Regions:
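Conserved phosphate-coupling serine/threonine residues in phosphotransfer and NTP-handling enzymes
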Residues: 14, 103-105
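N-terminal helical cap/lid subdomain that shapes the substrate entry/recognition surface
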Residues: 2-95
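Non-catalytic, surface-exposed connector residues within folded enzymatic/regulatory domains
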Residues: 43, 64, 82, 104, ...
């Protein structure tokens, strides 16, 4: 039965402890370009860079400058892991569970990730980026595509997410959802997930299997 299961992982705030860094980056860009939007960084959670540029930086020169800034920013990032995330992915693999990264990040950003952690290319059975989809979270397209690539039905998949759009995408894909309280407080996401965890340090394979019995 385990071999018909899959774990689908968002990247920032789930695998990597980087969400706070992106919040600071976009907060600064918001102060410079959109001081009239106080919650600028919050509005961008789960959205692709293409969408952000189209809506908030539509002028070509402005968009080009933002792309340059974020590329420089990501080149300097260390991409630290959320506690226990890499180990938990390994446990799923050992038990025959298919695993995928499902991220709103693009291929360009992933090149910076692979530069530091080339093993991620082979650790995950599929990697879905913003360049593979037409509609970003909260649309379920990315998670449904991941399930299809892994040869799994939605009911056989568990989504691990931290952002409101990502949690909603998992729900709309009709998958089990585990919320990580890394970006938002536990009480803010409790009603949007089947289980909420602070990180993966105490989340076991038995906990993972138990999710499938939740109605």
């Amino acid at each position: 039965m385990e071999k018909r299961r899959a774990g689908l992982f968002d990247l920032d705030g789930v695998i990597f402890d980087t969400e706070s860094e992106y919040t600071r980056f976009w907060r600064e860009q918001g102060k410079l370009a959109h001081p009239e939007i106080p919650d600028f960084s919050s509005r961008l959670k789960g959205r692709t860079l293409k969408e952000i540029l189209a809506e908030y930086f539509p002028q070509e020169q402005q968009a080009r400058e933002i792309v340059r800034r974020i590329d420089d920013f990501e080149r300097q990032m260390d991409f630290p892991f959320i506690k226990g995330s890499l180990e938990f992915v390994g446990i799923l693999k050992q038990n025959g569970v298919k695993v995928a990264i499902v991220t709103s990040s693009d291929d360009k950003k992933m090149k910076n990730v692979y530069r530091i952690y080339p093993q991620l290319k082979t650790l995950f059975d599929a990697i879905i980026t913003a360049d593979r989809i037409t509609r970003s979270k909260p649309d379920p397209e990315c998670y449904l595509l991941a399930a299809e690539q892994l040869g799994r039905k939605p009911a056989e998949c568990v989504v691990f997410e931290d952002s409101f759009p990502g949690l909603e995408a998992g729900r709309r894909a009709q998958m089990k959802v585990v919320g990580l309280a890394t970006t938002n407080a536990e009480d803010q996401i409790r009603d949007k997930a089947d289980r909420v965890i602070p990180d993966f340090s105490r989340f076991t394979f038995s906990d993972f299997v138990h999710l499938y019995s939740i109605k």
